[in-house]
């Protein structure tokens, strides 16, 4: 596979139809997630599929802020969370509390829901949609979401290994035609794709293999990269939100205040001088005196 395909999203349309598609391949951006946390194999695959899905979904909606894909349940896997920004930067994490089974999604997450949140940034209203997890595949659960929340015919194919996270999406645009013949044919051909083909074939080779008899137009690739949004400023704001007394209690109990970003594992450490400076610089009308 060429470097042109790596860490990129490729959009395509079937000419003279109401069907559009996307192919996404995450390499270095996916590796950056795995380098920061050791996950059991079944969870690595699920998180990789979620990363690929989030990249695909970010192209189906216009966002100025960020899109979050979240799985939350009471099973061995308690949380999967992926964030994609309007600048095509990504980060992701997962949390688990017991051995993660190899079997389907419902066994892994238990009673769970999938949520998609669009945060438009400053001044905008956040949108969130959700669907219960009733399928054994993440891609099928996302198809349920689109059928119920967006009322858009959507099909996805997702896969991941330790090197790549990949996905393909087909979507029928609303209101352009009452004839489903094109849609049904393109989905039927898409169903013949294998995980190995998604992982190994170049974009042009894969699209030719699937749709060489279709009139297809491929757009320029859109690059994606790993980038964490954590910063000293955000941690400062979080600590101020806890309040001076609680932060001082942590400091006295542990000797320092340490905050680890769950996405990138960056550690932010504060000593007594840092804490006093932090609260002295805040907008609080009164800063409690230093305890001795």
Task: State where each predicted segment sits.
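Cys/His-clustered metal-coordination modules, chiefly Zn-binding fingers
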Residues: 189-292
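Interaction interfaces in information-processing and related assembly proteins
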Residues: 2-220, 288-291
């Amino acid at each position: 596979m060429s470097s042109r395909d790596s860490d990129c999203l490729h959009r395509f349309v079937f000419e003279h139809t109401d069907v559009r598609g996307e192919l996404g391949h995450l390499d270095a951006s996916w590796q950056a997630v795995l380098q920061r946390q050791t996950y059991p194999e079944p969870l690595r695959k699920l998180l990789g599929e979620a990363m690929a899905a989030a990249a695909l979904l970010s192209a189906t909606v216009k966002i100025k802020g960020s899109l979050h894909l979240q799985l939350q349940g009471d099973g061995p896997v308690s949380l999967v969370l992926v964030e994609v920004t309007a600048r095509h930067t990504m980060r992701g994490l997962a949390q688990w509390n017991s051995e993660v089974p190899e079997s389907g999604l419902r066994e892994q997450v238990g009673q769970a829901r999938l949520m998609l949140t669009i945060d438009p940034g400053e001044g905008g209203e956040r949108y969130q949609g959700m669907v219960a997890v009733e399928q054994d595949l993440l891609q099928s659960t996302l198809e349920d979401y689109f059928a119920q929340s967006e009322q858009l015919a959507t099909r996805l194919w997702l896969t991941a290994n330790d090197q790549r996270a990949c996905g393909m999406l087909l979507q029928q645009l609303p209101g352009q035609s009452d004839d489903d013949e094109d849609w049904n044919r393109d989905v039927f051909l898409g169903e013949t794709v294998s995980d190995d083909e998604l992982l190994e074939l170049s974009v042009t080779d894969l699209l030719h293999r699937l749709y060489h008899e279709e009139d297809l137009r491929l757009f320029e690739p859109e690059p994606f990269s790993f980038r964490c949004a954590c910063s000293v400023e955000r941690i400062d704001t979080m600590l101020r939100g806890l309040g001076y007394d609680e932060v001082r209690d942590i400091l006295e109990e542990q000797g320092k205040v340490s905050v680890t970003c769950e996405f990138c594992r960056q550690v932010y450490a504060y000593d007594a001088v840092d804490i006093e400076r932090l609260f002295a610089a805040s907008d609080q009308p009164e800063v409690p005196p230093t305890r001795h």
